[in-house]
């Protein structure tokens, strides 16, 4: 890499939910019955100095409960590209929904990074409401609380620095404490949006995903994503199958599974 503090970014697809329609992915969907599958990802951010993981995904047990399909558990994909889960120094948790914080105990030596607002939300009075706690798994939340008590959680309030060239930024709406990650690469500043925009169309057409706490905040967060990135083409959504079509695979063996996000798009 030309810059010692530029990073390689890898999107690791570990699962999918094929049986979805547009009504599942957009508020007030126009063609509500048309198929609209989503993929499940975790992301690796690495250079010669460090390896950082964004989100931890979920396991086969959770997949069975939720009717999702898992091809590989995230740590299996990490191992496939030579990354030992125990060697990861930092894990950024975008938010505490089941598909982003479900295998926390697989990373025994990592420091976890979370927004204050997300922990408050996931452990506070909002969880008295069935509709708000639906995307959470209480066991995952309790695991994070235990990590707080063991000194392994760094809390951020709004903007925060993880390492040179890697920062987090609050983008609430889908969840109260959702954060995105801004990463320096040789092609510019890439923003890993996670669920701040599930699909490209959510933010490009400003049409929020229907699991939402605050629609106004979601719309403001779309603007924030674009402001943080070098261009809107540098914003990477959290669940869009198009990501694997718009970026090249790490190598021929990982086609459709592990793709690079720090290089120019293919479209």
Where are these regions (language model features)?
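Active-site metal-binding loops of divalent metal-dependent hydrolases
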Residues: 14-15, 56-59, 96, 117-118, ...
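Zn-dependent metallo-beta-lactamase
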Residues: 1-53, 58-60, 224, 249, ...
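Metallo-beta-lactamase
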Residues: 2, 72-83, 87, 117-170, ...
């Amino acid at each position: 890499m030309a810059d010692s503090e530029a990073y390689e970014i890898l999107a690791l697809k570990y699962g999918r939910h094929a049986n979805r329609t547009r009504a599942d992915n957009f508020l007030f969907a126009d063609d509500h019955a048309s198929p609209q599958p989503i993929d499940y990802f975790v992301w690796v951010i690495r250079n010669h100095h460090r390896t950082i993981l964004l989100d931890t995904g979920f396991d086969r047990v959770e997949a069975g409960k939720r009717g999702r399909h898992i091809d590989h558990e995230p740590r299996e994909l990490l191992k496939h590209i030579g990354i030992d889960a125990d060697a990861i120094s930092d894990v950024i948790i975008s938010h505490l929904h089941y598909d982003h914080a479900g295998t926390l105990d697989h990373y025994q030596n990592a420091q976890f990074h979370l927004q204050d607002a997300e922990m408050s939300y996931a452990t506070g009075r909002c969880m008295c409401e069935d509709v708000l706690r639906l995307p959470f798994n209480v066991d995952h939340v309790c695991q994070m609380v235990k990590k707080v008590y063991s000194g392994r959680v760094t809390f951020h309030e709004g903007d925060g620095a993880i390492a040179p060239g890697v920062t987090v930024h609050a983008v609430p709406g889908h969840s109260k404490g959702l954060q995105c990650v801004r990463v320096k690469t040789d092609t510019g500043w890439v923003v890993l949006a996670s669920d701040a925009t599930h699909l490209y169309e959510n933010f490009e057409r400003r049409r929020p995903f229907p699991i939402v706490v605050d629609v106004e905040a979601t719309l403001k967060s779309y603007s924030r994503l674009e402001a943080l990135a070098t261009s809107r083409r540098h914003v990477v959504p959290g669940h869009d199958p198009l990501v694997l079509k718009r970026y090249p695979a790490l190598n021929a063996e990982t086609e459709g599974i592990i793709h690079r996000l720090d290089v120019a798009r293919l479209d």
